[in-house]
Design a protein with these regions (language model features):
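Class I S-adenosyl-L-methionine
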Residues: 1-199, 231
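Conserved S-adenosyl-L-methionine
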Residues: 182-242
Length: 242
């Protein structure tokens, strides 16, 4: 695998933890990045002892300097109200954050007076005073009634929220192949851990959904499967987008 490569293994929850031990041995525990939980279906009613299973696992490993295109998800309306509770006169949602941080610097640029104020005891400004003054001139500092300055962060200037390790990408409702994967899930993985022109390998390509996603994302691809039916389905899927 390339020094910038990554590997994602999608596995059933029943054997996932055993497979992880093998992956640790092959790729090294130090290269383990995530055990991602994928919500695969809606809740079901089963007459058995145990909790309903709606998830499976994706094990993610990479080397020291992998390709990593930070994925972001759009904020929901609920996110915006929670994370950016304030609104200015123009109707823009925002929040504020402290402009000082723990740790004291006695002689550095981040310990100088700003608008006649020094950082609180045991803290320093997050940036130099020139930057603070520029923010203030640009209207990016909010002053409280007691004179406490805070940095304004506008919601419409943020790229969205970071993707966490619980993903809700349910199985296709009408799959064309028994093990067909959710195309949005594959898009996320491919665009995060590869660049245009990178090679994407799916050694159990099944219906070819991974290869189609790679093709549409301008990646090169290699697909392997021992089933002649899988090869036929994959060929049809790839030809449908050419």
């Amino acid at each position: 695998m390339s020094e910038r490569g990554s590997i994602y293994l999608h596995i059933d929850y029943k054997i996932g933890h055993y497979v992880k031990l093998l992956m640790d041995e092959i790729f090294g525990m130090e290269n383990f990045r995530n055990d991602i939980t994928r919500i695969k279906c809606n809740p079901k009613n089963f007459n058995r002892i145990g909790y309903g299973n709606i998830k499976d696992l994706i094990l993610f490993y990479s080397k020291n300097k992998p390709i990593w295109n930070e994925p972001r998800k759009p904020y929901t309306d609920q996110d915006l109200k929670k994370l950016f509770p304030k609104m200015n006169s123009e109707g823009r949602r925002y929040t504020t954050v402290p402009i000082h941080a723990p740790g004291e610097t006695k002689k550095g640029k981040s310990s100088q007076p700003f608008r006649g104020q020094l950082p609180p005891s045991g803290r320093h400004w997050r940036t130099d005073v020139k930057a603070l003054e520029r923010w203030d001139q640009e209207g990016l500092i909010e002053w409280s009634r007691t004179g406490n300055p805070r940095k304004i962060i506008f919601a419409d200037q943020q790229e969205g929220k970071r993707v966490q390790d619980i993903w809700e990408y349910k199985d296709p409702q009408y799959p064309s192949y028994p093990t067909e994967k959710n195309s949005d899930l594959l898009d996320l993985i491919i665009r995060t851990s590869s660049d245009e022109g990178s090679i994407v390998l799916d050694c159990f390509c099944g219906s070819g959904t991974t290869l189609k996603s790679a093709y549409l994302s301008q990646r090169k691809w290699i697909g392997i499967d021992q089933s002649e039916h899988a090869i036929r389905v994959t060929k049809i899927k790839i030809e449908s987008v050419e």
